[in-house]
Amino acid sequence: VNQNLYALLQSRFPADRAARCLILPGGEAVSYGALEDGVGRMAALLRAKGVQPGDRVAAQARKSPAALMLYLASLQAGAVFLPLNTAYTEAEIGYFLQDAEPRLFVQDAEALAREAESVAPLDHTHPAGPDELAALVYTSGTTGRAKGAMLSHANLAANALALVEAWGFSSSDVLLHALPIFHVHGLFVAVHCALLSGAPMLWLERFDEDAVMAALPRATVMMGVPTFYSRLLAEPRFTAEAAAHMRLFISGSAPLLESAFAAFEARTGKRILERYGMSEAQMITTNPLSGERLAGSVGYPLPGVSVRIAGGGDGGVVEIRGPSITSGYWRNAEKTRDAFTADGWFITGDIGRMDPDGRLWLSGRANDLIISGGLNVYPKEIELVLDDLPGVVESAVIGLPHPDFGEAVTAVIAGSGDEGAVIAAARAKLAAFKTPKRVIFVGDLPRNAMGKVEKAALRRQYAGLFG
């Protein structure tokens, strides 16, 4: 059996290829047949440009139907697809091109699609073995240089099949797709669920309140980062009526604030389904489709995925095993070795605890851990207290160098308030060693492309606060 992911996706396309695959804001649509034809022509063009199986194809392209076709064409041709954030500068791109050594670097997928129109479609799909690489996804690189997580055809297929089942996708779904397609969430999780189900996607170039509100009546499922949901909640047109017909709202890529979960349920009567994943493993756990979705929890391991807490008990590093997890980092044997335990489990670097029934709760990143006066402080615990205070939109708790404590607990708060009052309110609920020594008020917290708060940037900015 050909293990190529594109062969699997194609086998699930609707028998009637006139069925819509991508529906654009202007009302135009790309049928499954047109998608298939465009992919085949682009795959043939990749071959003509010298792309052989195993070669890397890098793309830093505007989100468009052509950009999606390029990804699928890369799979069909047996190349390794390398999606790059459209916000990266030339200097940043230089690192990825040097590290991955792609055969081809595409910045204009539409131009490539036009060129491919005159090429006969590739008449076969590269027969991939299960361990053959399909994609190279560079991690956000919050610690030093970004590393390229290697994902095989089998890795991607296993996760996609598990998600379709876990989230109950079918051909009667319509997915509202406003995510970027340069990362796991938008390119793999969202796209694969739709294509495996033969379902259409409402294809928005980016999240824009007007476009999302216009598309919502036709959708059944929406996937988003937490920022999408906080923006919808700030939108008066987003009412219980506007959301009533929706089957599912899914959130991931960054932690969903418990206050946002509660506000969303109060507004719509629906609970956002939060799930947990990372570039190296794709999706790991999910709250249940039917069953209790709890604020602050990322739910249960997907079928085939095993999760354990290092050191067991009430808080430790989350370690995982399963068919969707990377074999390691591109040309980086040392980082690959460091990423796995002696018995072969992948070390996520996330801190969490597990309920007896297997439900997972996360409390931050291991590298965000603050050690103050020799005591471990988990920022998430403090952030939950601060986020409940009046005037606080969102908080980020970091450790800053301190001559006496080693690290001092410091809160950076988006919002307004009085430093002394915030510290007093926190002290009423937290041990002294966990209470922020200083509170800094800002307009907005800095975020990376995935909507994650960039604590490393805050640590650099305020490094000298305590002398």
Predicted stretch roles:
Residues 35-41, 149-170, 178-182, 188, ...:
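Conserved structural elements of the adenylate-forming
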